[in-house]
Every structure is written in structure tokens, then in C-alpha cells.
């Protein structure tokens, strides 16, 4: 149970993350869970209901004790780092909106995360997936939705959250998609005809009317399709066809990058297409013109025709 004032601040913080920072729903939910875990620990630590004063006066011993508790509870290094990042984000929000001054929490460094290489699928596994994803849908429009979404992710290297935010307005430009990604960073992705044609076919039989600004990928009841729903479709596909365990919507984004690289595409062009600040932690990406990005597709992409 939370103090009413704190709950109001959390609600405002979540709206800020979505509306001003353009965070995905998944990130906001994860951050919210991490913050509540921190506040529950603070409640236990102080043996009383947490108030805004407890938050303002939290000392380094409390924060380090919370991190140690998460480590004891077998949270991964990545989860511990994300949790600290979430709490720091909330404190930064309090700095902007209340009288909270610079806090000791900002002096605490995140634990170093073990870097795992992204797992891509083989081109054969991608082909099997694209050929058979339509088998999981029960009705024609859902089958076509699944295929057009999967092709879009693999053809464009989009994050699942970005792909699920595509609207009719994105379809009006015949040459490229303008994507607002993490941290409100904009990037340009050339349209591949195969992706756009499938989406057009899907929209022609979609049983729901949509405004120009509404996401086009819908669930069976007409609401915006959620990532976990689509990944459940991929789990069925994976099990039936014996595809790799790491097959998820995100693995097609990794495959997009890996297959371009294997076919000779320039690293910095891939970097730009993915919307990364860098493909390594030390390398900043350079801007590439739309024509240059289109040239990458024309010469290197395996499903360009």
C-alpha cells in the first residue's frame, strides 16, 4: 500500500515517460514494477508506510541494501541495473516537478551488465517462419496480420513496439517510414514493397475502421495488438516446426542486422537503420542519407524482390 501523494506522483511519472519521453508500454511497466519493489523495501526498512519525506531522505545505506537484497533474491545483473535506472529516473522526475534537490542516488553506479551477443536466426529459419506464420490465426485477417507484421519487422529491423505503432499515416509515403524510436530519436527506414503490399492487403480485409493516427495492427477484439500476444503466435510456430528456442519477434530484428552484414552491408548503415547510438559501446553512429540507405537495401537485402 502506498501513500496517496506518492501514488499520484507515480501516475504522473508514468504519463511523463509515455507522453514526453516516448517510452514503450513494456518499459513503463518494468520501471513501475522496479520502483514499487524499491518502495516496498523502503517500507520494510523503515517499518512504516513510506511518505515523500522517506523518499527524499533515503540514504546510500538504504539504496545499497535494496540492491544487495535483489542480488540475494537472484535477480540478474541486467535486472538489478534496470531497477536502479528506474529509481534514478523517478528521482530525476521528482527533481523536475518538486523541491527535491540533487540526491545521493545519482552517485551510485549501475552494476556492469554481462554483454550477450544478440542471437539471430538463420536465413532458412526466417524463410520457414515467413512461409508458415499465416497458419496461426484462425481467420484470414489475423493470418495476414501475423505475416505482414513479421515481414515488416524483418524487412525494416523495427523493434516490436515500433512496428505495433505503425499507423495509416506511415503508409502515405511511398519511399520510407519515419520512425520515432527510443529516447524520441527519429530515423528513416526505406519501405520494401513486400512489406507494404502485405500491409495493404491486410488493411483491405481488417474488420475494424481505423483513423489515420491509430495503430493498424489490431487484436481479435479490435484493440491495439500487444507484443506478448504476437509472441504467443510465434511460440506456436516455433514448437510445431522445431525452430530455435530464441525465436521471438525481437530475434527477427537481430536477424535483419546480421543478414545485411553477412551480405556486405556497411556497419554504419545498419547502425542507422536499427536506430542505435552505436553497434558497439564505443562507436557513435553517423547519419546516412535516404538514398544511401536505399542503396543498402538494393544491393544487400535478401527479400528485396
Curated annotation (Swiss-Prot):
Cellular component per GO, a single term: cytoplasm
Highest taxon of the lineage: Bacteria
InterPro entries in alphabetical order: CB (IPR044068), DNA_brk_join_enz (IPR011010), Integrase-like_cat_sf (IPR013762), Integrase_catalytic (IPR002104), Integrase_recombinase_N (IPR010998), Integrase_SAM-like_N (IPR004107), Tyrosine_recombinase_XerC/XerD (IPR023009), Tyrosine_recombinase_XerCD (IPR050090)
Keywords carried by this UniProt record: Cell cycle, Cell division, Chromosome partition, Cytoplasm, DNA integration, DNA recombination, DNA-binding
Record domain Tyr recombinase: where: 116-298
Family indicated by similarity: Belongs to the 'phage' integrase family. XerC subfamily.
Record note on quaternary structure: Forms a cyclic heterotetrameric complex composed of two molecules of XerC and two molecules of XerD.
Known function: Site-specific tyrosine recombinase, which acts by catalyzing the cutting and rejoining of the recombining DNA molecules. The XerC-XerD complex is essential to convert dimers of the bacterial chromosome into monomers to permit their segregation at cell division. It also contributes to the segregational stability of plasmids.
PANTHER family: PHAGE INTEGRASE-RELATED, TYROSINE RECOMBINASE XERD
Protein name per Swiss-Prot or TrEMBL: Tyrosine recombinase XerC
